[in-house]
Amino acid sequence: PTGHTVIRWLGNAGFLINSRGTCLMVDPMLKGFDMPLLINMPIAPKDVPHLDAVLITHCDNDHYSVPTCTEMSSVCREYHSTFYMDSLMETQGLNSFGHRIGETFNVGPISIKLTPAYHTWQNEYPGYTREFKVEDYCGFLMKTPDGLIWAPGDSRFLPEFLELPAPDVIFFDFSDDSWHIGLEGAIKIANAYPKAQLLLSHWGTVDAPDMKPFNA
């Protein structure tokens, strides 16, 4: 346990939050990704000693890493996401819980609210077996004893992003891809919350220089 809240980047969109001994991971992708990587992941799933929860923003495999989540299932108490993601995690035998957008739940002393996201890129491509819904994707607004942390997840810019309680920390995705917040949207968010610390997310991990989603 620590007497404060510590945040560590895990590569790509993944973060570890240790808030006075309560430990969460958001979108950990620590093994088994299907593209070349630029970095060595800071920890292997088998070496994680304990997690109170894993939070997953959506189903893309650079956010919901099945190999990572299943290998940590013996040391992770619970997994949280949207209802659709809950259905996917249940098939892997994970102790998962689904929530609606706007719903709040608690993990220890941390209060967590699902924020909206718009990332239904799959609907633009043939071959998927379902029509994806906006509510299948989310972000997380996490109120810790030491401050407010916002993980937006993957999303196009939404006006609601400027109407949040002012976060102290934002996991900042400023990829200029059409299905991400984009540079213009990122600037709006930074200007809306000038006191927030911006921790860069979704960059510097996947070796795909021609793919905007993986590059700022």
Question: Which residues does each PLM region occupy?
Answer:
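Active-site HxH/HxHxD metal-binding segment of metal-dependent hydrolases
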Residues: 42-105, 113, 118-121
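Beta-strand-turn-beta hairpins that frame and shape the catalytic cleft
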Residues: 2-5, 18-24, 104-113, 143-149
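Active-site-proximal loop/helix segment associated with metal-binding centers of metalloenzymes
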Residues: 113-146, 160
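Conserved catalytic scaffold of divalent metal-dependent phosphoesterases
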Residues: 22-32, 99-105, 109-120, 156-157, ...
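Pre-active-site segment of Zn-dependent metallo-hydrolases
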Residues: 10, 14-59, 66-71, 121-131, ...
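Cap/insert and terminal regions of metallo-dependent hydrolase folds
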Residues: 80, 84-87, 156-216
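Bacterial Sec-exported substrate-binding components of ABC uptake systems
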Residues: 1-13
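Active-site neighborhood of phospho(di)ester-bond hydrolases with catalytic His/Asp-centered motifs
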Residues: 25-27, 50-62, 79-82, 150-153, ...
